[in-house]
Amino acid sequence: EGVCLHVFMWNDRKNKYIKLKNRLVPQLELYNYLKYKLDKLADMIDIENYPHTGSANAGPCQKRLSAISLDDKWIGHFLDYAGDERILVKAGRFGKRLSTQTFEQVLYEAIMESLGYKNNKEQFKHLGTIASINDIKRLIPSDVSIQERSRKIQALLFGMSGLLPSQISRYKSAKDKYSHEYINDVEQIWSVIKNDIVNKPMGGELWSFKYSRPGNYPTRRIAAISRLLAENFETGIFRVILKSFDQRDNSKSGIEGTKAIIKNTESIFLELYDEYWSNYYIFGGRRLKNRERLIGKERSSVIFINIIVPVLLAYARKMNDTVLEERLFKAYKMHSRLSPNNIT
């Protein structure tokens, strides 16, 4: 009786009204008003901001999930029975991308997007496509130190993002000698690399520094992914993370072994430091009193749950790897619930 408007995606019957108890209710078809195709809109939904399971907002499957023994025989079917549609949807999307992309590229783009937080997700996602893993492998030498490799990747990603000082008209001159030396170095590297790049760099004005803690600025996040790529250059991020799930300590109990998987995987992100960006928030900014890691505990947890678990789930199902699927289930179920404030 309280219906005043009937809203749906497609109007199959083409009627402008429906009749309810002797009164006409107007209908609204949404399809003609969509700005993008449904597949693109689905990818744009920020699932990470959906409520996480908890006593105040748990869904109908949470009670059943909490009562499940980790040793139940159906555990290999993973989240089909666990009831977390959020993870399944993400795994499905990553699975679709795998039809045209490598596992390494899919994971790289997903991590990039996760580093973008609310205001820079699309920017980071685009950066991951115009400066792909193949581009990085092609342009960055492998026979150099991790630090030098990281700096070259930084030059590439900063240049393609449009965030280098030479690309920003309102850039203020560096305040100290070390910043001058660093900036000159990455600018010089970029001046050479850019000649071998086909894709057009982004505009620096597209990036948002508002409403973010300085430690979460795009510049710091680009430095973080650069270091991550540099440290795992030969093997690749995907294989390194996959290996952390394969190397469970058999001497430990099931619970302790799963905890070790979580700890070892998150440590890949928690132990990222850079000679420059662990001491600065922006190009030429004021030097920090204490060195800071590039990715904190909170963000590494978000990446573990929202990126690593669904990407590896897509991989496990593609490869029919029930052992990996079981380990993913156990790690997912054991992982402490993410903070309600996990998105900045």
Describe these PLM feature segments.
Residues 4:
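Short hydrophobic-acidic sequence motifs that mark active-site Asp/Glu residues
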Residues 7-142:
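Internal, well-ordered alpha/beta segment that forms a basic, Gly-enriched binding/recognition surface
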Residues 82-343:
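Hydrophobic, aromatic-lined core segments that form the binding pocket/scaffold
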